């Protein structure tokens, strides 16, 4: 499949923010676009369900203001990644024998205004460059086997849906391919992948991102999966007070969860998937109990952040009791 205007739109992407301008802070701007109906490259994998840390449900909860967005800008891995990025770009340019430009802009897609992009680099011959740094043994093994992790493929193809920007000598043309450069060791060259763009993948990705943004707009949560991320987020969905009888579909998930629970070491994700399905359905129906199947239960917990704040303000230990809050409901299978 060749790139089409239904994927790329017409013309160069619009510059939303120029991070070289004084007073324009990348982290502050990025946080703004983490809310509402926008999808950035690093969020594409969550939409597709291949992000190992953030599920589609969690991303939906965060974008709709139902769940806090963790600030990872000060995490060591993120800081080191930012520091090493220009070094890895330089190494990659030397390995490929081409000049790589680092555009310091946030772009908006001309046809799909929910898609934003911030490119790590663009080669002089029109290839998209993405840089990663990691010490993950699993990813190192994939690099050695010539495999690209699915979450990175999603991010790369999100960016590939944009045309080359206005400052490039080939402005307005589709990207000619992509380069993924992965640094896993300070004393070794990065793994460099020089690949073609899968335009069918891009087409499917746009469709799924559009559907996801409509879910954010309409307040409709995506189906939870069996990830830890979904298991935490599903507990934050509102639960009502009513009851209902179990349908055949609910009984099927209920039995599958119980079967998986007998051997959680090998079926933990399956167990969470079926349990999360029931929990999300109960939220949708605004009930707290499915007779003979499941019910919710709440407990009190200590909000440590609030406790620290109160103690710092008043230096009064008895305020501990004021810092207790009701936890999100636990789902109990019967």
Where are these regions (language model features)?
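Accessory terminal regions of nucleic-acid processing enzymes
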Residues: 1-334
């Amino acid at each position: 499949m060749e790139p089409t205007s239904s994927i790329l739109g017409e013309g160069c992407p619009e510059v939303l923010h120029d991070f070289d301008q004084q007073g324009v802070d990348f982290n502050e701007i990025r946080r703004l676009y983490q809310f509402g109906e926008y999808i950035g490259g690093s969020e594409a994998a969550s939409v597709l369900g291949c992000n190992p840390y953030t599920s589609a449900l969690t991303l939906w909860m965060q974008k709709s203001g139902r769940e806090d967005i963790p600030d990872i800008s000060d995490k060591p891995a993120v800081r080191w990644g930012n520091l090493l990025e220009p070094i890895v770009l330089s190494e990659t340019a030397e390995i490929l024998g081409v000049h790589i430009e680092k555009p310091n802009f946030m772009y908006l897609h001309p046809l799909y205004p929910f898609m934003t992009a911030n490119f790590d680099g663009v080669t002089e011959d029109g290839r998209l460059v993405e840089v990663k740094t990691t010490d993950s043994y699993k990813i190192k093994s994939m690099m050695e086997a010539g495999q690209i992790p699915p979450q990175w493929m999603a991010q790369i193809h999100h960016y590939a849906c944009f045309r080359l920007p206005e400052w490039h000598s080939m402005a307005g043309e589709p990207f000619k391919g992509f380069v993924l450069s992965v640094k896993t060791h300070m004393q070794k060259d990065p793994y460099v992948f020089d690949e073609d763009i899968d335009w069918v993948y891009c087409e499917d990705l746009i469709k799924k991102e559009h559907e996801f943004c409509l879910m954010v707009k309409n307040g409709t949560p995506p189906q939870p999966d069996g990830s830890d991320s979904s298991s935490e987020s599903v507990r934050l969905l509102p639960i009502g007070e009513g009851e209902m009888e179990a349908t055949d579909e609910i009984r099927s998930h209920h039995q599958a969860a119980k079967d998986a629970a007998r051997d959680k070491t090998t079926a933990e994700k399956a167990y969470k998937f079926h349990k999360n399905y029931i929990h999300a359905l109960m939220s949708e129906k605004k009930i707290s109990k499915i007779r003979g199947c499941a019910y919710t239960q709440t407990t009190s917990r200590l909000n440590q952040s609030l406790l620290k704040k109160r103690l710092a303000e008043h230096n009064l230990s008895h305020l501990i009791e004021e810092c207790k809050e009701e936890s999100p409901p636990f789902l109990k299978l019967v």
